[in-house]
């Protein structure tokens, strides 16, 4: 907690690397290492190093499967939501603001980056709120929710499915 100590033991490890995950973003921590040899003789403290905790960047990949009827609309698939919480100065809740990339008639994708623990809500559209995703029985859907998680690779993959669209058969308004 303070430069120059005193120090508190936070872990006993048998590798040459350690990741301290019990930290607070923006706080500065001071670390020293002590080693034991095979006879359990303890070394002196290493030189002190300081580190300031920062949230890690997550690569966020959305893959969405859409109904076969989507292609006949000649519209692109969009994502709308609290995208302004992600990197890149993205719009908030703009139904035609962020287009996905078409992979084939029923698969679309987009990749973002953002900081771990960021929470977002989102929906898929065909460019406007008159063509927003609907449920299996053409029912209204709540917002999808997601918390960015770094995991083991730094990439979070979200596989979603849109069952129907408003104003596209079989759904009306």
For the regions a protein language model found, what residue spans apply to each?
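Short S/T/G- and acidic-enriched coil/turn segments that sit immediately N-terminal to beta-strands
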Residues: 14-19, 106-108
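Extracellular fibronectin type III
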Residues: 36-55
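Aromatic-rich carbohydrate-binding modules that target alpha-glucans
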Residues: 68-117, 127-149
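Beta-strand-rich modules
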Residues: 20-41
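Extracellular Ig-like/FN3 beta-sandwich strand-entry sites
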Residues: 26-28, 117-121
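Compositionally biased low-complexity segments at domain edges in trafficked proteins
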Residues: 151-173
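Short beta-strand segments within Ig-like beta-sandwich modules, predominantly Fibronectin type-III
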Residues: 9-14, 99-103
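Extracellular low-complexity, O-glycosylation-prone stalks/linkers
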Residues: 1-8, 32
């Amino acid at each position: 907690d303070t430069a120059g100590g005193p120090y508190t033991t936070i872990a006993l490890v048998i590798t040459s690397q350690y990741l301290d995950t019990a930290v607070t973003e923006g706080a500065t921590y001071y670390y020293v290492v002590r080693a034991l040899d095979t006879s359990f003789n303890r070394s002196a403290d290493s030189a002190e190093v300081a580190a300031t905790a920062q949230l890690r960047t997550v690569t966020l990949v959305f893959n969405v499967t859409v109904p076969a009827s989507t292609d006949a609309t000649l519209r692109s698939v969009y994502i709308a939501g609290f995208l302004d919480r992600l990197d890149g100065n993205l719009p908030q809740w703009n139904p035609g603001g962020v287009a996905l990339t078409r992979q084939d008639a029923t698969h679309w994708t987009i990749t973002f980056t953002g900081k771990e623990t960021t929470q977002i809500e989102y929906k898929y559209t065909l460019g406007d709120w008159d063509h927003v995703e609907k449920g299996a029985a053409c029912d209204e859907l709540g917002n999808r929710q997601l918390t960015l998680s770094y995991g083991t690779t730094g990439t979070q993959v979200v596989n979603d499915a849109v069952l129907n669209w408003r104003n596209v058969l079989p759904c009306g308004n």
